[in-house]
Amino acid sequence: MKRSYSYILSLLALLLTVSGIHSLGVLANPQLAQHKPKNESKYTDLTLKKDSTEIVLPLDENEELDFSLVHTLEYEEDASLPFIKNETPTPWADSVFNSLTVKERVAQLFMVAAYSNRDAAHKTELIKLITEEKIGGLIFFQGDPASQMELTKCYQDITQTPLWLGMDIEWGLSMRLSNSIHYPYQMTLGAMDNDSLVYEMGAQIAQQMKRMGVHVSFSPVLDVNNNPNNPVINYRSFGENRENVSEKGLMYIKGLQENGVLACAKHFPGHGDTDMDSHLALPTVNHNRNRLDSIELFPFKNAINEGVGSIMVAHLHIPVLDNRENRATTLSSATVNTLLKKQLNFKGLSFTDALNMKGVAKYFQPGEVDLEALKAGNDVLLFSEDVPQAIKKIMAAIASGEISEETINTRCLKILKTKEWLGLNKKEKLDKTDLVKDLNSEEFNWLNQRLADASITLLRNENNTLPFLKINENKTAVI
């Protein structure tokens, strides 16, 4: 039977380590062994932080310390963001909003694809969208750190309203950028017992994002991957256990948001039990509502209750939610307005998945899909195929009463409040000096080692195939 490469990777991820043999984490990634901090003595006490109070647990100087358990955490009692609770004054957002025309408010809802490894024509096209259409943000894809920072400075210098920048950073900047840290896939993290390490990873990723001038991480994946034939989620999920997915997802979200970047949980209402890639077609999920509530929606409900700032809506066909033919959840008011915003009481930002994906793009003309996504209740339109045409369609819909100006105003102001929370009311200082060095610090690499150590799991060792009983007498091959 043929198995995809990603399927094999997912199996290898589950086979990462042996309980009780901590040192084998180095075997999982031997290059990381060299990144053990030189000033290891700073780890001789275990420090826990809550609010401003530190609790130090001294360790005997002769006691061997398990580095996978060392962490410094600072949790907030309430993880809700100010722009969600709508209680914190946002003078900058209010001022900018009042300065924009209706068309410019519509343009704030668009986040357009950007690459730092493409030619001058791509850059020229983006400059036109920024200066003429006055789009709200960019989602960066493939490239390298220095080139992306150069482009970021260029685009921010020419925009009327500061751009917010997003990236898919599920396992770190390396998902899109060269010369950056590659943290473990979520399936690997799903094998860990120590969830606090996921918080630390989220916090480090937030630090690296801010160094790059990036504000939104389209992560974590909260899909419960209960279909072994899933071609697109697979190792990107924390696994098939809903509690494990939820708990680790929450730690990832808090690590990001408590360190100043916006998390975006995906792919609502759950892309785990599919056997089709929504980049290529529209997958159907035929479960009843009770099943969706108990499995697929479980991690999202918990994330909403804990204050996740944004959620990405998937391109799925779920007849129990909306039985119109070829109607994706992204374009379904029953899914976004009714289920997500009313029934689950989500007050944050809802992003569409990329609107150029065949799961939606094959059924609508450019511009039409954007309007349908807005009517469904989405706040941010990601990767539109034709921004000028989409803005024209939306403006015509406002004029005809198909969508209200008040709806546009509400969503635009929510985006501007988010930008203010992200610090975009102040000019960012972007400096390429030592950029790659900063993104690959000893501290970051050492956490990567601890994540590898903590994720090692022995599923079965029949007939002592793995020679751990005589580890000094045998050689172990690492694949």
Predicted regions and their residues:
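A substrate-binding/cap region within the structured catalytic cores of diverse enzymes
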Residues: 192-214, 221-249, 253, 257, ...
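Catalytic domains of carbohydrate-active enzymes, especially glycoside hydrolases
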Residues: 125-141, 203-216
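Active-site-adjacent structural elements in enzyme catalytic domains
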Residues: 145-162, 195-213, 406-413, 417
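Preference for extracellular/luminal or secreted protein segments
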Residues: 2-6, 10-14, 20-112, 116-128, ...
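Short glycine-enriched loops at secondary-structure junctions
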Residues: 114-118, 165-175, 215-225, 265-271, ...
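Active-site mouth loops of central-metabolism enzymes
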Residues: 109-120, 186-199, 281-295, 357-364
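Second-shell residues forming the walls of enzyme active-site clefts
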Residues: 101, 138, 148-163, 173-175, ...
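Short, acidic/polar
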Residues: 118-131, 198-205, 293-300, 365-370
